[in-house]
From Swiss-Prot:
Role of this protein: Forms part of the ribosomal stalk, playing a central role in the interaction of the ribosome with GTP-bound translation factors.
Organism (species): Levilactobacillus brevis (strain ATCC 367 / BCRC 12310 / CIP 105137 / JCM 1170 / LMG 11437 / NCIMB 947 / NCTC 947) (Lactobacillus brevis)
Protein name: Large ribosomal subunit protein uL10
Keywords tagged on the record: Ribonucleoprotein, Ribosomal protein, RNA-binding, rRNA-binding
Similarity annotation: Belongs to the universal ribosomal protein uL10 family.
CDD domains: Ribosomal_L10
HAMAP family reported in the protein's UniProt record: Ribosomal_uL10 (MF_00362)
Lineage of origin: Bacteria, Bacillati, Bacillota, Bacilli, Lactobacillales
The gene coding this protein: rplJ
InterPro entries in the record: Ribosomal_uL10, Ribosomal_uL10-like_sf, Ribosomal_uL10_bac, Ribosomal_uL10_bac_type, Ribosomal_uL10_CS_bac
GO biological process: translation
Length: 168
């Protein structure tokens, strides 16, 4: 192999290492059996969720995962492999891929990592059922507002009752 080819592959490995390091999560899938239309639809759904899916050679993935500290993932790099990287919402790839895999049997989730922790297929399925960060924050805000709102209604009722007593 020429030095130029080796340099190109080394650069490709470094690019993938950077993707691993910048991502809050990465989910590895086997896309064997998907049609071009299905892959295009999956990429669109992932893009809308802020996730980027890349098809990367297994040897490059193996080397990049080792360098990035995710060598435990090397067992899942076999066959046609794509990786969905998310730099923002760590749960987004799991949600989109799980939903898509439920509707299309050909997509197989193999494993990945979420916020630095290697996760199994079962763990990915659990994460996929969790509400998003925004949904959790909205629920928390609603729960925090409820007691204040109840006190405000109680004070208003007392004031209204006092006004009725003054009128009589």
């Amino acid at each position: 192999m020429s030095e130029k080819a080796i340099a190109v592959k080394a650069q490709h490995v470094e690019d993938v290492v950077e993707k691993f390091n910048n991502a809050t999560s990465a989910i590895v899938v086997d896309y064997r059996g998907l049609t071009v239309e299905q892959v295009t639809d999956l990429r669109k759904q992932l893009r809308e969720a802020g996730v980027q899916m890349n098809v990367i050679k297994n040897k490059i993935l193996t080397r990049a995962a080792e360098k990035a500290g995710y060598g435990d993932l090397n067992d899942v790099f076999a066959g046609p492999t794509a990786v969905a990287f998310s730099n923002e919402d760590p749960i987004a790839p799991a949600k989109v891929l799980k939903k898509f895999a439920d509707s299309v049997d050909a997509l197989e989730i193999k494993g990945g990592y979420i916020e630095g922790n290697i996760v199994s297929i079962d763990e990915i399925n659990v994460y996929a059922t969790l509400p998003s960060r925004e949904e959790l924050l909205a629920t928390l805000a609603s729960q925090l507002q409820a007691p204040v709102r109840n006190v405000a209604y109680a004070i208003k009722a007392i004031v209204d009752k006092g006004d009725e007593g003054d009128a009589a």
